[in-house]
From Swiss-Prot:
One of its GO terms (cellular component) is plasma membrane. Belongs to the EssA family. It comes from Bacillus subtilis (strain 168). This is ESX secretion system protein YueC. Required for YukE secretion. Probable component or regulator of the ESX/ESAT-6-like secretion system (BsEss). The keyword Transmembrane applies. It comes from the Bacteria.
Length: 151
């Protein structure tokens, strides 16, 4: 019954009053006052106040530190050999990276390893496929024979 009333709009509609007077909004034009004086006169929008004495004494200059030179000398070194960088240590030890690293001269060992590894994977696949086929060949007749005995 409820679903039937949903499809009929007159049954679901609420009763409303017929004589509802709705008055439209009336727009009355009002004059807009735009103050453009601040565009022409700087003194109009600037607030004139005098700075207090405490703010007059404030400076933005960094005070000179007497120990700055000593600290700078501690953490900087002009001698490159005393430096603890990788470049300085490799220079002290006589290690250069300009030469190419030594490689194996015989490539037959790597070829043999590649051949055995390339043959090993297909052999594993063949063995797995043969085991799967053998399992299917032997198991399916046994299962069908057991079903025939039950029937």
């Amino acid at each position: 019954m409820l679903s039937f009333s949903l499809f009929i709009p007159s049954a679901a509609a609420a009763q409303t009053e017929e004589n509802t007077d709705v008055a439209p909004n009336q727009y009355e034009k009002k004059d807009i006052e735009i103050d453009t004086n601040y565009l022409h006169e700087d003194t109009y929008y600037e607030e004139k106040t005098e700075l207090p004495e405490e703010q007059k004494d404030i400076t933005f200059d960094k005070p000179k530190d007497k120990d700055a030179e000593l600290i700078k000398d501690l953490f900087t070194s002009t001698n490159a050999e005393d430096s603890n960088t990788i470049a300085a240590q490799s220079k002290q030890l006589g290690i250069t990276f300009a030469e190419k690293p030594m490689t194996k001269t015989s490539s037959t060992e790597t070829e043999d390893e590649q051949e055995t590894s390339s043959l090993l994977l297909p052999m594993i696949y063949v063995v797995l496929i043969l085991l799967g086929i053998a399992g299917i060949v032997f198991l399916i007749p046994k299962v069908t024979a057991q079903e025939n005995k039950k029937a």
